[in-house]
Amino acid sequence: MSEYLQQIAKRRTFAIISHPDAGKTTITEKMLLFGNAIKTAGTVKAKKSGIHATSDWMEMEKQRGISITTSVMQFPYNGRIINLLDTPGHEDFSEDTYRTLTAVDSALMVVDAVKGVEDRTIKLMNVCRLRDTPIVTFMNKFDRDTRDPLELLDEVENILKIKCAPMNWPIGMGKYFKGVYDLYNDEVTLFETGHGHEIYPYKKIKGLANAKDAIGIDLYEDLEMEIDLVRGASHEFDEQEFLEGNLTPVYFGTALSNFGVKEMMDGFTRYAPAPQHREADQRVVAADEQKLTGFVFKIQANMDEKHRDRIAFFRICSGKYEKGMKIFHERTGKQMQISKALTFMAGEREQVEEGYAGDIIGFHNHGSIQIGDSFTQGEKLKFKGIPNFAPEIFKRVKLNDPLKMKALQKGLVQLSEEGATQVFKPFISNDLVLGAVGVLQFDVVAQRLASEYNVKCSYEGVNVTLARWIFCNDEKKLNDFKKKYEVNLAYDGAGYLTYLAPTGVNLQLAQEKNPDIIFSATREH
């Protein structure tokens, strides 16, 4: 195999999906520890001590202890090169989180075993479903009193509609947590407290029968019964089913104590796919093609207070990036020279000399690049599957100075191109309605309108709870629909027709009465 193909085969590009506080940032830190990317793992919540999680680096994040922006971290592990895209887990997350999942080849789902499957996890799993992304699951926090592990598997299968294949099994929980049993290698790994900040060689015992004394007779007997149950009732791991997104291997442990993380990472690097082929409008692009192609899935503003810049995050789909190369911007038809592409280690910028399929690199963007833009070495190629997601929270924008209407509109359209929020212009009023996926987005937009566009605005409530993009192949039916529902219709920032529903019932009735109209919760960029 050539050096070029080896580089691609090594890459594993994935994101972590979880509900806020399920332990995602902690598990990220432990992975970086195993990848020698950091020396000691800083516990994330210990704000007073001044130890901040490596992956939470924007000022707002440092203040709140949450990850708002998507950082990208690259580190080596097990002969692979891991590209980990950290996604915001907090309530105040944005479409960025959803869109990041379009740039990965697999995902790690972290479940808080005390609480089980939660709302945010369900939403993120639905996004993974759009592309049948392979999912690995880590059941976290077994050093606490958790739910019954069989019940947890049942919940994942019923709510998330994916088969579970446990790879190991917890021995006890909470203060009686003794470790995990590897179901495929007949090996017990014993748990000890106090090793959360280091890589610790936890004791292993080959053969379940040999671990009887170490775990105690009562737990041993319970474990034997549970293992029989699990083997009878759960699914065997099947690599093909996993790669098709139908089955998830499940690992148990506690990220805070750095226990069970290594086993999960070993499994992940073994089974998760290398960079996959990608669909473009014109054809399917294979990862091992020689020419560079890729797409922008995120634009991040002001990543550096000193530079006041915007960075476009670019997923390489094929070929090799080399410093100083010229690339073709498909939407504008222009050539661009990329002299300073960046790679990130959560706020630590480094200039990158080369990049391969699966890698994420950053371009400086002076306003010409939008989310969803494709770049090639000359071929007219537009990648599919970088969606806009329907917002879930809406507010009316109130301008403090009416003379600044033009600046406000310009600012909102530019910020919506960046994916920060979406702006809607209703048919029957001059008001602008702003939509976002998380509450924090409204603060971010107001802050940036003031600092970058010199426009001060405030928000007030608006009678909108849902938005759906409208598509119809029959022009006459579409025009009839527009006349009949003009009070609910608006155009978004990119000029797409949108239905703004005051209630879920209103939307349902409109859908039932208009079977030829497509009401879509996503649209392509």
Swiss-Prot record:
Family according to the record: Belongs to the TRAFAC class translation factor GTPase superfamily. Classic translation factor GTPase family. PrfC subfamily.
GO terms, molecular function: GTP binding; GTPase activity; guanosine tetraphosphate binding; translation release factor activity, codon nonspecific; translation release factor activity, codon specific
Species annotation: Francisella tularensis subsp. novicida (strain U112)
Descriptive protein name: Peptide chain release factor 3
Family annotation (InterPro entries): EF-G-like_DII, EFG_III/V, G_TR_CS, P-loop_NTPase, PrfC, RF3_C, RF3_dom_3_sf, RF3_GTP-bd
Source domain of life: Bacteria
Keyword Transmembrane in annotation: no
A single cellular component GO annotation: cytosol
Keyword terms of this UniProt record: Cytoplasm, GTP-binding, Nucleotide-binding, Protein biosynthesis
Annotated positions binding GTP: 18-25, 86-90, 140-143
UniProt subcellular location: Cytoplasm
Residue stretches making up the tr-type G domain: 9-276
UniProt main location, coarse: cytoplasm
Gene Ontology biological process terms in this record: regulation of translational termination
Coiled-coil features, chain-numbered ranges: none
Disulfide bridges in this chain: none
Protein purpose: Increases the formation of ribosomal termination complexes and stimulates activities of RF-1 and RF-2. It binds guanine nucleotides and has strong preference for UGA stop codons. It may interact directly with the ribosome. The stimulation of RF-1 and RF-2 is significantly reduced by GTP and GDP, but not by GMP.
